Regions:
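Cytoplasmic helix-loop-helix junction between adjacent transmembrane helices
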Residues: 151-190
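Short hydrophobic/alpha-helical segments at membrane-entry points of transmembrane helices
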Residues: 144-152, 265
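Interfacial helix-cap and linker-helix signal at transmembrane-aqueous boundaries
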Residues: 83-84, 115-116, 200-208, 288
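Extracytoplasmic
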Residues: 57-91, 112, 279-285
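Helix-loop-helix hairpin linking two adjacent transmembrane segments in secondary transporters
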Residues: 147, 176, 185-232
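Residue-level signature of mid-helix packing/kink "hotspots" within the transmembrane helices
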Residues: 74, 102-110, 194-195, 306
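Conserved MFS/SLC helix-loop-helix module at the cytosolic interface between two early adjacent transmembrane helices
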Residues: 107-145
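Juxtamembrane intracellular "pre-TM" segments in multi-pass secondary transporters
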Residues: 43-52, 233-266
Length: 306
């Protein structure tokens, strides 16, 4: 019998060991910081194709996530004059009800992707939506302005768990040929959420007062979270990474900031978005005073240009 047939499988040659490692059929090294606690094997990703039932469920679920996230963020913008009167604060101070939310949102987005690698994509997005919606229900019950601001800041911190993680989920699960379509559906949810959150709350405020209007947006967020939980399929291609690998993420962030062109892109986006939000923050004060004297629902309609 040829000598190569007499070799034991338990003691492969160097060539065999290299071939085996390339196929990744053996467990990952225990001292690998990115190794999973479970045995992982490298397999071809199972993409979700456009037109399939799973694709439709994902599209609807992430549309709801985008809608809820941005309606909760921006629903206070038309209410800033009302909040200034109720809490006896000036226009600049009242704008903190939105500025703190968006500021903490930006901070949370930097961390959300890393956290989701340890907790799971769907779980983090669902928890973020539920907690933020509950905070939006609590906010109108508060009589202290600073407590109101704390709740709004926490709301932004929680909502940061949706935008970055939603994109990561889509990139992992959707067929690359249909990824642009799936991301477009999610982004349309954010745009419609930001618009309707501003417009709907204006009509609700005229009918029921700002307390009920703001609480209603929180209830709507919980309904969206329920639909998200039911519709979004479990991840197929996600590989959990235990712990928070801070050094890995610090290197990634440093790479973005030291890039020759990216910091300028970041600054352009920050300044453009800052100007956009600031104009809409203060236009309500001008339109609610003489000589215009517009109602909350009329002020809300101004945001249709958004």
């Amino acid at each position: 019998m040829p000598a190569y047939r007499e070799k034991s499988p338990a003691a492969p040659s160097d060539c065999d060991a290299d071939t085996t490692s390339q196929k990744s059929t053996s467990p990952q090294r225990v001292d690998d910081p990115l190794a999973s606690t479970n045995v992982q094997t490298t397999t071809e990703p199972v993409w979700i194709k456009p037109g399939s039932a799973a694709f439709r469920r994902i599209s609807i679920a992430l549309f709801l996530a985008g809608y809820a996230t941005f309606s909760l963020i921006y629903c206070v913008q038309p209410l800033l004059p009302e909040l200034a009167r109720h809490f006896a604060v000036g226009p600049a101070e009242s704008s903190l009800a939105l500025s703190l939310t968006t500021g903490f949102l930006a901070f949370a987005i930097l961390l959300a992707g890393a956290v989701s690698e340890a907790t799971g994509r769907k779980k983090l997005m669902l928890v973020s939506m539920c907690v933020a919606s509950i905070l939006n229900l609590i906010a109108p019950l508060l009589s202290d302005w600073h407590a109101f601001l704390v709740v709004r800041a926490l709301e932004g911190l929680m909502l940061g768990g949706v935008p970055a993680v939603a994109m990561a989920y889509l990139a992992e699960e959707i067929d690359p040929k249909a990824l642009g379509m799936a991301m477009g559906i999610y982004i349309s949810g954010t745009a419609i959420g930001g618009l309707s959150g501003r417009v709907v709350i204006g009509f609700l405020t005229d009918l029921f007062g700002w307390h009920i209007a703001l609480g209603s947006m929180g209830a709507l967020g919980l309904v969206a979270a329920l639909g998200f939980a039911v519709l979004l399929p479990a991840s197929r291609n996600f590989v959990r990474r235990p712990g928070f690998q801070i050094r890995y993420h610090l290197r990634a962030w440093a790479g973005h900031l030291t890039h020759a062109g990216l910091p300028f892109v970041f600054l352009i986006g920050a300044f453009a978005m800052g100007c956009f939000v600031t104009i809409f923050n203060y236009v309500g004060f001008r339109l609610s005073d003489a000589p215009y004297g517009l109602s909350q629902s009329q002020i809300g309609l101004i945001f249709v240009v958004y």
